[in-house]
Amino acid sequence: MQNKVHVRKQDTVMVISGKDKGKIGEVLRVLPKSGKVVVKDVNVVTKHQKPSRENMQGGIIHVEAPIYSSKVMLYCTKCKSVTRINHKILDDGTKVRVCKKCGETF
């Protein structure tokens, strides 16, 4: 069963718990089966890469690892704070996400 993930790709989010608490970044990938998201420059892990045909050099690389979506919250760039969202239907029938604090659309 897939978990409901409240953020989408390219959303700006803030980490609200864990070792990276307070960091703001962009969602790179959403993994709905595991309920996790990959955020830019958050939860960076060190990976030891063996030399291969594609990467002749090998070495140590840094990659963003997934974190649970419950540890991130949507960040509104207009009011500069984390916020929950409302869903609003516009006159033309499209459904948009709206900041609860300032009314800005995402």
Swiss-Prot record:
InterPro entries: KOW (IPR005824), Rib_uL2_dom2 (IPR014722), Ribosomal_uL24 (IPR003256), Ribosomal_uL24_KOW (IPR041988), Translation_prot_SH3-like_sf (IPR008991)
SMART domains referenced in this protein's UniProt entry, alphabetically: KOW
Keywords attached to this entry: Ribonucleoprotein, Ribosomal protein, RNA-binding, rRNA-binding
GO term, biological process aspect, one: translation
One Pfam family, short name: ribosomal_L24
One GO CC term on file: ribosome
Domain of life, source organism: Bacteria
An example molecular function term from Gene Ontology annotations: structural constituent of ribosome
PANTHER family associated with the record: MITOCHONDRIAL RIBOSOMAL PROTEIN L24 (PTHR12903)
Family: Belongs to the universal ribosomal protein uL24 family.
Self-association state and partner proteins as the record states: Part of the 50S ribosomal subunit.
Record function comment: One of two assembly initiator proteins, it binds directly to the 5'-end of the 23S rRNA, where it nucleates assembly of the 50S subunit.
Protein name listed in UniProt: Large ribosomal subunit protein uL24
Gene that encodes it: rplX
